[in-house]
């Protein structure tokens, strides 16, 4: 029995050595059979468990290192993001503050220079209304009167409390003073009027109502005085080259026509130039009227003479119509007829033309602030 057991034990030892030498189910002599392997199952499971445990320990040993590295990277990224956020926030706020400050500075400067829309419109309308009136102010004496008014206005403005407005109005008055000193051109007169209008607009914005009212009254008086400044001709008269002409709407004989003109400080028209002749001939032909002029040969037949005693110049004889004067039936007085002159009987009733010099607007200085003079009545029409 003992001899038989020993060979079996030797066989088992050889089998275990083969199993241990081929871990992972590999045998040097090849696989015996699936049943043989399963017969040694506990040993195989132990080997597998040992292998898995060793691999797990290796992996677990690596985890703290990778975790610590990831955490440090996260911390670094978070710190960088925080710093970047702060930097961007500061940069944005500073740039916006600078931009807003610059815009406010520009806006403040622009608003400080611009007047209100309503004031601009008021200035423009006032300027338009008075421009025509000031345009007829040709005399230096009248400009001097306006300058005196401006001087009084300047003194009143100087008492007002708002310094900035005082300075602005004072500068306007200074410019007005220089403009008035330069005199009668219409452009200068218009400039004066514009400055007066701007001054009125500036005064309207002042807080002191009593002073404002005082200055406003001065401006109203000055405006009225400018509007009353003399017109070259009375109403219903026509201005031409320094003279005024009245064309009647009724008819009289030649002698009564002379009287009608004298009653208004004029005379039956005496023609002095070719331009005047053309102007008067046009007026008469437009109305299709026969109109007396101040020319006759009553003193000496065939010698034509004006009512002021001056003779008819040879150059004017061209204005007679063809065949005239013919002195048919004692035709001793001249008239405008069609496109030229004609002689006719002096006792016939016709329209007439009066002539006198235009006003020079150089009367007393008191006229500026005195009531408007009454317009001379035209001769009976």
From Swiss-Prot:
User: Any idea where this protein resides?
Assistant: Membrane
Q: What is its main location?
A: membrane
Annotated GO CC locations: membrane
Mark the sequence repeats by their residue spans: 96-118, 119-141, 142-164, 165-187, 188-210, 211-234
User: Ranges in the Extracellular compartment?
Assistant: 59-381
Q: Does the keyword Ribonucleoprotein apply?
A: no
Q: Which residues are glycosylated?
A: 80
The cysteines covalently paired via disulfide bonds are 233-244, 261-354, 333-346
- Residue ranges constituting the C-type lectin domain according to the UniProt record: 240-355
One Pfam family per UniProt:
Lectin_C
- Membrane topology (Cytoplasmic): 1-37
**More info:** In vitro, is a receptor for HIV-1, HIV-2 and SIV and transmits viruses to permissive T-cells.
Q: What does this protein do?
A: Pathogen-recognition receptor expressed on the surface of immature dendritic cells (DCs) and involved in initiation of primary immune response. Thought to mediate the endocytosis of pathogens which are subsequently degraded in lysosomal compartments. The receptor returns to the cell membrane surface and the pathogen-derived antigens are presented to resting T-cells via MHC class II proteins to initiate the adaptive immune response. Probably recognizes in a calcium-dependent manner high mannose N-linked oligosaccharides in a variety of pathogen antigens.
| Subunit text | Homotetramer. Interacts with C1QBP; the interaction is indicative for a C1q:C1QBP:CD209 signaling complex. Interacts with ICAM2 and ICAM3 by binding to mannose-like carbohydrates. Interacts (via C-type lectin domain) with CEACAM1 (via Lewis X moieties); this interaction is regulated by the glycosylation pattern of CEACAM1 on cell types and regulates contact between dendritic cells and neutrophils.
**Name of the protein in question:** CD209 antigen
Source organism per entry reads Macaca nemestrina
Q: Corresponding gene?
A: CD209
């Amino acid at each position: 029995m003992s001899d038989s057991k020993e060979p079996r034990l030797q066989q088992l030892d050889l089998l275990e050595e083969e199993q241990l030498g081929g871990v992972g189910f590999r045998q040097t002599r090849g696989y015996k059979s699936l049943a043989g392997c399963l017969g040694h199952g506990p040993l195989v499971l132990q080997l597998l468990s040992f292998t898995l445990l060793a691999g797990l320990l290796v992996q677990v040993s690596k985890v703290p290192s990778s975790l610590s590295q990831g955490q440090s990277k996260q911390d670094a990224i978070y710190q960088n993001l925080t710093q970047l956020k702060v930097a961007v926030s500061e940069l944005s706020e500073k740039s916006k503050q600078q931009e807003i400050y610059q815009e406010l500075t520009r806006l403040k400067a622009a608003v400080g220079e611009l007047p209100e829309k309503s004031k601009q419109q008021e200035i423009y309308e006032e300027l338009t209304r008075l421009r025509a009136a000031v345009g007829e102010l040709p005399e230096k004496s009248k400009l001097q009167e306006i300058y005196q008014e401006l001087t009084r206005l300047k003194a009143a403005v100087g008492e007002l409390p708002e310094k900035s407005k005082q300075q602005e109005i004072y500068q306007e008055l200074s410019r007005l003073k220089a403009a008035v000193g330069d005199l009668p051109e219409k452009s200068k007169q218009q400039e004066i009027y514009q400055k007066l209008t701007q001054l009125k607009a500036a005064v309207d914005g002042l807080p002191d109502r009593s002073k404002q009212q005082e200055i406003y009254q001065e401006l109203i008086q000055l405006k009225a005085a400018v509007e009353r400044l003399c017109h070259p001709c009375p109403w219903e008269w026509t201005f031409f080259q320094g003279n005024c002409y009245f064309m009647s709407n009724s008819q009289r004989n030649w002698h009564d026509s002379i009287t009608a003109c004298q009653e208004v400080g004029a005379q039956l028209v005496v023609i002095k130039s070719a331009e005047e002749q053309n102007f008067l001939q046009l007026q008469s032909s437009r109305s299709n009227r026969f109109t007396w002029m101040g020319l006759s040969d009553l003193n000496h037949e065939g010698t034509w003479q004006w009512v002021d005693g001056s003779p008819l110049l040879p150059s004017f004889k061209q204005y007679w119509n063809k065949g005239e004067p013919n002195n048919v039936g004692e035709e001793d007085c001249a008239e405008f007829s069609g496109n030229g002159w004609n002689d006719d009987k002096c006792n016939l009733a016709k329209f007439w033309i009066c002539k006198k010099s235009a006003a020079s607007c150089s009367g007393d200085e008191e006229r500026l602030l005195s009531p408007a003079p009454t317009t001379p009545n035209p001769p009976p029409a």
